Amino acid sequence: MNATRIPTLDDLTSAVRFLTQLPRLLRRTFTTEEVHALLRRDLGRREVNFLDLARTAIFANSKSPFRKLLHYAGCEYHEVENLVRKKGLEETLRELYRRGVYLTVEEAKGRRPVIRDNTNFYVAPEDLRNPGLQADIAVRTSGSRGRGTLVPIDFASFRANSYDAYLDLETRCGLSWHHAFWLVPGSLVITRFIRYTLSGARIARWFTLVDPGSAALHLRYNWSMRFLRWAGLLAGVRFPRPIYTEFQNPIAIVHWMESVLHAGETPHLHSYASCVVRVCETALEHGISLVGAQFTMVGEPLTAARLAIVQRAGARASIRYASAEMSVVGFGCMAPQATDEVHFMTDRCAV
């Protein structure tokens, strides 16, 4: 066995937490009343939530680079609190930005030093982690310009931050759809399975772009797929087995969607934008109608050309804009003026 594929002690510890804590999380699904109450709560507590985060994750955290930047700007907690009370959250962030309290992508990744006048330091990825969160699992950023960064996910707080998937499906009348995923193995798949399950959505198929039997696949990812299904069984939820489906030949997905449509139901595939396009191209090549099918496109921009192929196949698509660091930032608009228009999640984000 290749040494790089041997699970580490951290992997084994995460596996134990995974199997003991995830079933408990999955057993209690959202209700409509609960979701809308959580949304009202978070919209009404934006400033309070921000100040709580600033106090515990920044000012009480000696490793936080934002604490260093705030010190450089001459801001203590009470001043930030006063700014928020007087000017509101967005204007406070603009004021802090003008004072140099921000990180560029290059600075946050540690590729360039943070330089503000006489202040000069490097940021390590772990310096940006919230010390109050336990890393039950970790997701890795896309790493489009280098190796991705690990971002911890805490099951204890996961549920309170997962109701957005319910709202998206509810808005699209999609809670009763037959849902499927076509993604690469890893923690991002796991988090999406959890979000959909908490919404009470049925996951009918699990298509994977990487062969689970491949010798090149790290054991961590192979076992994570098994642990997810085992945790589901412990919670009374039966997750489907992963089905290896090559990018160039997604005919199995097309046939599944066709069978659901023939049964008078709605199939919904959650996948990367280029993969959705390939599914629609395959359907067109085989003369199979996807009228009534739904897609959620992630990971890549939804261009006019991509949307045109989806529409030509008879399907409809929405987008989901997210990052590993921030989770969901925006969901697709139901009446967009542009193909990639999203509704910004102001309950959890601010610009």
Where are the predicted features?
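Glycine-rich, aromatic-lined ligand/substrate-binding cores of catalytic
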Residues: 349
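Active-site phosphate/ATP/adenylate-binding loop shared across adenylate-forming ligases
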Residues: 7-29, 34, 38-318, 325-341, ...
